[in-house]
């Protein structure tokens, strides 16, 4: 490591001198010698040239000292052919893969920042044109044209299909095409002009050169100037173009009827136009002519043999449109479901509060958490005690007494407590807590009870010691505590009669302790 203010080239010269002669360079300070020795382990001489191999000794980077060599390396790694320059990250990667000097990172940054070619290229920013979506307010004012295919060649030599969709009414016209040349598409568009008149704009998702050819043909055949524009101009929202139901059903129909798919395109168009659409709840036919068509035959869903071809087509179109509606929820449903999922995820991520994870009760011996500090990537806790739970407040906090019987000033949260389990090596003790006797948890007379037994059982068995002499419990509070413990003992004795002998053996030892204390 190079000390602050020291020349990096001088540092490398000192390392090279030490590796070559085994002695320190005359300019090396006494405080720098240990650093030179450590750094020299990462360098080796190969063919009278110094190479940096690193700690793992797997690298092989030539040490560059002179300024001329540095500029040559930077020029070779930054310029990649005529007119192509790398950025800072790529240039630094190329330099560090083969060369080494102490200030390589800063030198690469300064070299790229000072490059005139990079500055000119960076200042030339192509700003995307601002999109101005046209507002469609009248029928047949803005029309989109989509091309589909190639399909199976029909009996009339048609291979492609052209779909014209009115953005305001969703009126659909499907026409067959033999090819997708500009002249063929222009002829099909003019046939629609003769039926409904020319719209204000026709939007196509094609390249500009192809659109210019179509405009030339339309002007030659119909006299319309620049009526077709590109969808890339941003004049229409792509989601408002041809409905996906039309494209999906047309692809399916052409696959099922490879020879005659072009003969039924007018029927398909009319079937889609008399089918109600979701946003307005009206059919495109009604939006276009402000009236509903007079259908001579009501199409049946079953599509039996008695129905016409057009009726079967209308039934299939309505069925396909219903499937798409069922699969695609409404915008309000999507927003509500999204909000519900977000709320559920937030609730799931929220960690539940552990109010009393150890099920602690009055009389339990516990350790309390006093201090937290950060260590080894997590918080460490300091536990002090033991203390005894005197009572539990309405808010769920515990009031504790220490081993001298002194009540602590502040209540402690139950989540900041944990049970205190005595070690088997500790002596059997009995301490007095301001008028109430609390026995120790270490049972000499009960060898079959393992250490760490559930605290409720330990407290019940400890409570039997309090029955030895009721006269010792003078205060009313102690009397209530004794009755509570006796009730617990009676239930235990009825269910576990086998513990009676152990309990009385413990009573004898406790009597001796009480007589000694008295």
UniProtKB/Swiss-Prot annotation:
Gene3D superfamilies the record matches: 1.10.340.70, Ribonuclease H-like superfamily/Ribonuclease H
Phosphoprotein among keywords: yes
Gene Ontology biological-process annotations: DNA integration
Residues with the Phosphoserine modification: 498
Phosphoprotein in keyword set: yes
Top-rank taxon: Eukaryota
One Pfam short name: Integrase_H2C2
UniProtKB keywords: Phosphoprotein
SUPFAM superfamilies, A to Z: Ribonuclease H-like
InterPro entries: Integrase_cat-core, Integrase_H2C2, Retrovirus_Pol_polyprotein, RNaseH-like_sf, RNaseH_sf
A molecular function GO annotation: nucleic acid binding
Segments for region (Disordered): 326-348
Domain Integrase catalytic per the UniProt entry, residue ranges: 135-293
Name by which UniProt lists this protein: Gypsy retrotransposon integrase-like protein 1
Organism listed in the record: Rattus norvegicus
Gene name of this polypeptide: GIN1
């Amino acid at each position: 490591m190079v000390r602050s203010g020291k020349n990096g080239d001088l540092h490398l010269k000192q390392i090279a001198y030490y590796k070559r002669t085994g002695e320190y360079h005359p300019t090396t300070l006494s405080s720098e010698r240990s650093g030179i020795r450590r750094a020299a382990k990462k360098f080796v001489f190969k063919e009278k040239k110094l190479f940096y191999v690193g700690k793992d000794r797997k690298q092989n980077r030539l040490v560059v000292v002179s300024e001329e060599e540095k500029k040559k390396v930077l020029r070779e790694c930054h310029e990649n052919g005529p007119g192509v320059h790398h950025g800072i990250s790529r240039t630094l990667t190329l330099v560090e893969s083969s060369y080494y000097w102490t200030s390589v990172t800063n030198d690469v940054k300064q070299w790229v920042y000072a490059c005139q070619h990079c500055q000119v290229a960076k200042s030339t920013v192509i700003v995307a044109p601002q999109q101005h979506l046209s507002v469609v307010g009248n029928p047949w004012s803005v029309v989109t044209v989509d091309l589909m295919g190639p399909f199976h060649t029909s009996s009339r030599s048609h291979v492609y299909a052209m779909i014209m969709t009115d953005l305001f009414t969703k009126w659909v016209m499907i026409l067959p095409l033999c090819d997708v040349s500009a002249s063929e598409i222009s002829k099909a568009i003019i046939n629609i002009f003769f039926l409904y008149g020319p719209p204000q704009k026709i939007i196509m998702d094609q390249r500009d050169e192809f659109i210019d050819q179509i405009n030339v043909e339309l002007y030659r055949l119909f006299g319309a100037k620049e009526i077709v524009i590109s969808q890339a101009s941003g004049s229409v929202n792509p989601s408002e173009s041809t409905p996906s139901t039309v494209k999906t059903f047309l692809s399916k129909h052409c696959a099922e009827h490879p020879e005659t798919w072009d003969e039924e395109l007018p029927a398909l168009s009319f079937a889609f136009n008399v089918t109600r659409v979701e946003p307005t709840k009206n059919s495109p036919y009604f939006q276009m002519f402000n009236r509903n068509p007079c259908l001579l035959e009501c199409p049946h869903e079953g599509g039996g043999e008695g129905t016409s071809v057009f009726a079967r087509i209308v039934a299939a179109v309505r069925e396909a449109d219903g499937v798409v509606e069922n699969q695609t929820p409404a915008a309000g449903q999507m927003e509500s479901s999204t909000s519900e999922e977000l709320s559920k995820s937030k609730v799931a991520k929220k960690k539940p509060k552990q109010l009393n994870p150890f099920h602690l009760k009055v009389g339990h011996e516990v350790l309390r958490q006093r201090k937290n500090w950060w260590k080894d990537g997590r918080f460490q806790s300091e536990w002090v005690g033991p203390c005894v739970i005197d009572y539990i407040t309405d808010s769920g906090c515990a009031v504790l007494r220490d081993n001298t019987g002194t009540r602590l000033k502040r209540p402690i949260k139950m989540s900041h407590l944990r049970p205190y389990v005595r070690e088997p090596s500790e002596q059997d003790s009995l301490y007095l807590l301001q008028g109430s006797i609390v026995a120790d948890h270490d049972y000499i007379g009960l060898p079959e009870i393992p250490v760490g037994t559930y605290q409720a059982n330990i407290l019940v068995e400890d409570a039997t010691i309090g029955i030895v002499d009721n006269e010792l419990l003078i205060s009313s509070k102690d009397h209530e505590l004794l009755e509570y413990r006796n009730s617990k003992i009676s239930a235990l004795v009825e269910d576990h009669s086998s513990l009676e002998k152990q309990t009385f053996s413990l009573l004898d030892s406790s009597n001796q302790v009480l007589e000694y204390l008295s």
